[in-house]
Amino acid sequence: MLARVFSCAVVGLEGVIVEVEVDYTNGLPGMTIVGLPDTAVQESRERVQTAVKNAGLHFPRHRIVVNLAPAAVRKEGPAYDLPIALGVIILAGHLPHAVVDSTLVVGELSLDGVVRHTRGILPMAATARANGYKRMFVPEMDAGEAALIPDLEVIPVKSLADLYDHLAGRRLIEPYQASSSDELEPLFIPTNFSEIKGQEHVKRALEVAAAGGHNVLMVGSPGSGKTLLARAMPGILPEMSIEESLDVTRIYSIADQLPAGTPLIRHRPFRSPHHTISHAGLVGGGNIPKPGEISLAHRGVLFLDEFPEFGTRVLEVMRQPMEDKVVTISRAKGTLTFSANFQLIAAMNPCQCGYYGDSLKPCTCASAVVTKYQKRISGPLLDRIDIHIEVPRVDYEKLSGDRVGESSEAIRGRVQAARDIQKIGRAHV
């Protein structure tokens, strides 16, 4: 009788339940995996066989066929190692079939049977709960991520041997319990506005932008503080709600950029890619599309320094995501949509040498060169940037003065109040 274990695939930002069927067939001993598996899934044959033996269990001397259904969904990554191994163990008679009822299983296996980190645990856990599963076996280091989903029993698995002992009733594994220590340091620590001398009009413009969710373009000579001001922007944005935090964490989990020990991102992202980035790196892409920088900046700030130095194609592909707050990527293997509700902060020099209009250093660019440099940014893209502001050089007296500026916390309070008023206004429209 075939063994049936349930696992999960991630397609875009959503999970898809995968039924792992394991059965014997006639032929020489070995294992065949069908159901549109990629190379990593095909390689699980060797990992599973060695891990089962190293767990002290007998591996059947039969020809084993593993079917991953639905066959129309491409299966990628090593997350199917653990469910395949569990299916083999059940098929061999080491465990009854009922031990995996209402259970979702994911995890990569090492040759010694240790269960390794798997990306995309959060959307998998959300899919498990949405489909009525009561329990989920996950790698021990990913348990905090899965535990963010309520009403789902999360069992942290350290090794295949431990999982077998748990299901056999020999040594039970306690369900994971979330604690306050799960909320660790933020991914990015913004600069405090109180540490920035001068530029009061720019600070005010950024406050208005934060209150209204506007995109900003700062133009100024080198050393005027554009980067410092941009890095302070996340500090005045309102704190994320739990729904927004889960939304952001889901993207980082799928992109495998969630730091170890940080199951939930509570602070707004700040992404600052280099101007040599490709358009696929910025908006997402690849043969099997993955989130790009604009999706990793979802609910946060995307800072593009040296704005005109980005490739024309790279900048132009941002126009649709800036309007729709999502990016749709079409490939031969399918079309995926990623969230991209970011706030753009762009910075640029006024000319190629950087000192056009500077109060101290003269510009060496010809008028035609200045015009050509500024036209690297197309009109349609500039139309999507609501606030354009000049950032002049700060004079020595302000830099050396003792006056402390207003803190980010105080500004954030006004920004939050403005957004609350907007919510009330929209409710009465």
Name each model feature, range by range:
Residues 34, 40-45, 58-60, 67-77, ...:
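Basic, amphipathic alpha-helical bundle interface domains used for macromolecular binding and assembly
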Residues 1-217, 221-227, 330:
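Peripheral, non-AAA+ core regions of ATP-driven protein-machinery
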Residues 112, 304-311, 354:
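Catalytic P-loop NTPase motifs of RecA-like helicase/translocase cores
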